[in-house]
């Protein structure tokens, strides 16, 4: 399944729904629309053949979510998605506060 900028494997999203409290890749793709999302290179899981990135951002305007993706054919191919941990939410909101305080 794909949209204009994001892609994923349907079988993988089905297993992700079961494993991560009903979170589909289609829903998780909303994280890329969050202008305040945190994004970093995933040193631990990247290989020479495949770079991976971690994004922490909001979906449905309030739920902080973590998405792992790899760039493929000019799209962001989602590998995994889950709801964020307490520490990940804290990092997201601390960054958001810093951004807002500069305005």
Where are each of the predicted segments found?
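Ribonuclease/tRNase effector modules and their secretory precursors
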Residues: 1-103
